[in-house]
Amino acid sequence: MNPVIKTFQFGQSTVTLETGRIARQATGAVLVTVDNDVTVLVTVVGAKQADPGKGFFPLSVHYQEKTYAAGKIPGGFFKREGRPSEKETLTSRLIDRPIRPLFPEGFMNEVQVVCTVVSTSKKTDPDIAAMIGTSAALAISGIPFEGPIGAARVAFHESTGYLLNPTYEQLAASSLDMVVAGTADAVLMVESEAQELTEDQMLGAVLFAHDEFQAVIQAVKELAAEAAKPTWDWKPAVANTELFNAIRAEFGEAVSQGYTITVKADRYARLGELRDQAIAKFSGEEGQPSASEVKEIFGEIEYRTVRENIVNGKPRIDGRDTKTVRPLNIEVGVLPKTHGSALFTRGETQALVVATLGTARDAQLLDTLEGEKKDPFMLHYNFPPFSVGECGRMGGAGRREIGHGRLARRSVQAMLPAADVFPYTIRVVSEITESNGSSSMASVCGASLALMDAGVPMKAPVAGIAMGLVKEGEKFAVLTDILGDEDHLGDMDFKVAGTAKGVTALQMDIKINGITEEIMEIALGQALEARLNILGQMNQIIGQSRTELSANAPTMIAMKIDTDKIRDVIGKGGATIRAICEETKASIDIEDDGSIKIFGETKEAAEAAKQRILGITAEAEIGKIYVGKVERIVDFGAFVNILPGKDGLVHISMLSDARVEKVTDILKEGQEVEVLVLDVDNRGRIKLSIKDVAAAKASGV
C-alpha cells in the first residue's frame, strides 16, 4: 500500500502519523514524529487464534529506547541494549494501563505492542509520542478495540496555569508532572506527582488534558478512515445463561454469606469450598460443562454479588461503610541497627519500611537518552509471595514492583529536603509482609515514618489512600481504603497521596466508561478526609523528624575551602586525599567550587578527616603561637613545621634573648617547640620566633 500520512497540531507541537512505509508485516504499524524532533515506531501484532487456556487477556506492551536515537553508543562490555531500564518498564506500564480495558471482554487473542524510540533530542520525553502511536496502530490494525485513545502531559505553574506537553526544562520548574490518557468521552488513566497541589488543581489538570487530547483522537480517527484494515470478524462466546442461573440458584446465597466473613484467609477458604462443590456438581461427566467454564461462571457470581451488595448500601466485605479506613497500627524504630524503620499496618495490609542513609558516592548512576545523571533518592518496593499466603517466584523486581515503588517514591519525593540542606543519599525499602489491598499506599505511609525516624528533615509527613468505585447503571458507590477483592471486582483504582496541605501524587486507573467529574470530585473529597485521618494517627506516633540522626547512620560534615587549595588537598595523583581516607576511614567528595563533604561511619572518623583538611588548607596567622616540630637544623637557624606542609624559619637570632653560638645548643631535630609567627612574605615564606613567645603570651595572644 502507499504510505498514508496525517499531520495535526497538538498544543505547540506538530505531530505526524505515518503508516504503510515501515514494518508492513505487522498487523498495524505507525511512525510518530513530533516537531521533527522525536520519532517513535509503534507496531501491533495480534494472533489470529485465541488462547482461552490462559484465563486472562494476553496483552504485552514493550517500550524500548534505542541509544542510537540520541546519537549514543551503549556502555558496558557488549555495547548493545540489554534488559529494560526502569524508565522503559514504567513507560510500558503507562501505555498498557489505558488500552487494556478497551479490548472487548472475552477477547483472548494474544496482542503485542512494541514502541521503539528511534530518534529523539534531549528536550522532551518520548512517552506521549509512544502512547499516541499505540492508539493509532491499534486503530488501523483491525483488532477489536474500543478506541482510539489520546494522551497528554500537563505541567502547572501558579502564575501561568496549566501547560500542555512541557519540555524537561519546563517540567523542572513546574509543581506538577501529570500524564493523562483516555477516550473521547472518558478519562481512563492518570499518573502524576505534585508539590502539594489542591484537589481542585489536580482535577483541573485532568480535565485540561482530556480537552486537549481530543485533537489526537480526531487525527487517529482520520488516519483510520484512510488506512485501517478490515475489522476482525470476532464475536464473544455466547453466555450460558441456563448454567449461570442454575449455579446461582444453588450457591448464590452461600456466596453472599461467604462474603460476610471478614478475615481474608477464612473467606477465601470458604469460597474455595463452594467453588469446588459447584465444579463437582455441574461438571465432570461427558456432555456437561467443563470445570473451567463452571469456575468462570462462579467467579461472575462472586463479582455480581459483591457489587450488588455495595451499590445497594449493604456493608462491605469486611463490614465497613464506604468511608471508613481500616484500623491502623503504627510503630517506628522497630529494627535496632537500621538508620530508620517503621511497621505500618492497616487492616490486613502491612509494610515493614526501612530508610538507609549513604554518601554521595552511593547515589544511583542513571544512563538515559538525556545523558548520565545521579539519583540520590531510591525507593524500592518488594512484594514476596508469602504476603498473600502463597508460594511463588522469588528473584528480581517485576513490572508491578517497579511501578508500585515509583508511585511511592513520587508520593514522598516532594517532601524531601534539598541536597544542600541534607546531602545524604537516601534509600527506602518497603517490604510488604501482608497484603489485602493498597500495599503501595501503605508503603507511602511507612516511608514517611521511616524517613522521619532516620532524622531526615522532611518538610511534612505524607500519607496515602486507595479509593475504589462500584458503578451499576446510575447507581454508584465510592469506596475508601479498598480491599484486594474490591480492587479486583470494582471499576476504579484511585490512589491519592499527600500532606495535610495538598496532593503529592495521584494515580488513577478506570476500567469502564462513564466516570464523571462528579465521581472524581467525590473520590478526591473522600480521599482527603481519609488522608487527614491517617496523618493524624501517624502524628501521634512521630509528628516530625528526629532532631538527630541514628547513631548507626554515617556522620556528614560539610565545609568549604579556597579553590586554590583543592590541589593541595587532593595531592599529586590523588595521593593526599587517598591517604586521608585510608587513615581516617572516611570518604571525601570535593566539588570544583571548593565544597567538601566528609562522610564517616563514626563522628570521630569524619572529624579526624576534617582536621586533616583544615591543617592542609590553613594559612599561618601573623601574631599567632603554634606548637611546631623541628624538622631541620642549619647553621643560621631551624626549620619548624607548624601546619601540614608548612615550615617556617626560626633564625638563630630569634632563638633566645641570650647570644646563641650554635643552634644545636638550644634545639634538636624532632623536638616540639612553641613558636610565634612574625611575618609571612609575598612568596609564602614564614618567619618564626621562639624568644618572643613569652612576651606574646603575657600580652594575651
From Swiss-Prot:
Principal location class: cytoplasm
The reaction(s) this protein catalyses: RNA(n+1) + phosphate = RNA(n) + a ribonucleoside 5'-diphosphate
Any one GO MF annotation of this record: 3'-5'-RNA exonuclease activity
UniProt keyword Magnesium present: yes
EC number: 2.7.7.8
Occurrences of domain S1 motif (ranges): 623-691
The UniProt record lists the keyword Protease: no
Location of this chain's protein in the cell: Cytoplasm
KH domain sequence ranges: 554-613
Record InterPro entries: ExoRNase_PH_dom1, ExoRNase_PH_dom2, ExoRNase_PH_dom2_sf, KH_dom, KH_dom_type_1, KH_dom_type_1_sf, NA-bd_OB-fold, PNPase
Keywords recorded for this protein, A-Z: Cytoplasm, Magnesium, Metal-binding, Nucleotidyltransferase, RNA-binding, Transferase
Any one Gene Ontology cellular component term annotated for this protein: cytosol
NCBIfam families: polynuc_phos, PRK11824.1
Entry similarity comment: Belongs to the polyribonucleotide nucleotidyltransferase family.
Description of how the protein assembles with itself and partners: Component of the RNA degradosome, which is a multiprotein complex involved in RNA processing and mRNA degradation.
Its job: Involved in mRNA degradation. Catalyzes the phosphorolysis of single-stranded polyribonucleotides processively in the 3'- to 5'-direction.
Protein name in UniProt: Polyribonucleotide nucleotidyltransferase
Gene: pnp
